[in-house]
Amino acid sequence: AFKPDDLSIQICTVHCHLELKNYNEALKYYFKLDYLDNKSTKAWRPIAWCSFLTGKYDQARNYYKKIMDNQPNTQDFLNAGHTEWALQNIKGALAFYKKAVEKESGDFSKFQEQFNQDIPDLLVAGIEEAEVPLMMDQLRYSLSDIF
């Protein structure tokens, strides 16, 4: 029998929506997954990222705050930085980007490689292309105190 609330079916469905870039539809499924498996934090990252990609920056920020309390990784810091930047919080963005570089043991080029992959998403989020190198310079400057 077909069980629409079966977790594995939900996961397969949401992956299809992600591949098709149907982020709003994917969000609905991630919220459902989060509800069905409320002891897990697995849905938080995709909810935060899909929220960012759909312009729901406050919602993304709320999920990144939750993620920060649950063993954040480099990508979490990077994406939280993007979210803060989209919300015009430059200081907050820099702080998260700095943590992302620190998580990579100070390897700025590794950070920049990951960052560069997200530039198209940043532009869609309203970040001016001319601001990107300025942010990188500001980040490099702020890191010179540490590394």
What role is predicted for each listed range?
Residues D69-P72, H82-F108, L134-Y141:
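TPR/TPR-like (Sel1-like) alpha-helical repeat modules
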Residues G106-F147:
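Terminal, low-structured helical/coil segments at or just beyond the last alpha-helical repeat
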Residues E19, L53-T54, A86, D121:
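Register position in tetratricopeptide repeats
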